[in-house]
Every structure is written in C-alpha cells, then in structure tokens.
C-alpha cells in the first residue's frame, strides 16, 4: 500500500518495528523504526505519507509520536535509548524538522556518491572519504530527537 509512494525500493529493515497511522479508519502514513544501539539510539526511517495527506501536518505529528514512543515501554530497548535518528531528503520535511524544537539537525549530504566506485575503491584497499547517499544522488539531511526533548 505505501511502497509505491516511497522513492526507494528496499528490502524490509532488519529488527524493525513498523507503524501505520490512521485518520478516521484510513491508513495515511507509515514508518519503520529499528535499533541503532551502537550509538544508544533508534533509527526511524522510510516514512511515507499518502499523497492526499501530504502538507496537512499529519507526517510531523506521526513522526513525533512514533519517535516519542521509543523512549517508553512501547520499545523494549527504551532504557538504552538516548536519541532517535531520522534522515530525509524531502525539503518540506527538512524545514519542518528544523522548526520543531524537539529535533536537532546533525548532518547533511547535499549530493550522493557513486556506490559502485566506492566498492571498487575499497576492493583496491583505498579508503574513501566520499559521503554516500544510498546511491540515489539526493540531498539527505539527518536529525536527532533526544530523550530530554521527546516528552
């Protein structure tokens, strides 16, 4: 239902919990959240808001609530979670996240890198400092919600 509206075709995330948001019984948004415990956090991603609901504020409310839940008993790792991380390439969502006091921007990659070239360089024993954007050549910006700001 949501896959045709996401710009990447990817396999399901390992160890992820999937959330669907409803308005009056209609499924309007989706997001996955997976542990990123090596940095004391969770990774929220693959958010999709159905086209007819985009721009209505549903996505931000959904994102904030799902991420807030990661600091509660709803997440089995909640005691280990210090932050929730979220990356997006959507300019409107980036602007909304920067306006929201719950979120801090922590990264941005304004252009993608060639994945095949990176693999070739690594196979040759060369290190690469070229940032990657998943091979889709979109500007990607990263945000973090810290536990203290979530509630």
Residues covered by each model-derived region:
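Short His-Asn-centered micro-motif
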Residues: 45-47, 66, 84-89
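Terminal substrate-recognition subdomain of acyl/acetyltransferases
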Residues: 1-40, 71-151
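Conserved acetyl-CoA-binding loop-helix of GNAT-fold acetyltransferases
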Residues: 49, 54-71
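Conserved acetyl-CoA binding element of GNAT-fold acetyltransferases
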Residues: 40-51
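A structural signal for well-ordered alpha-helical segments within the folded catalytic domains
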Residues: 42, 56, 60-64, 91, ...
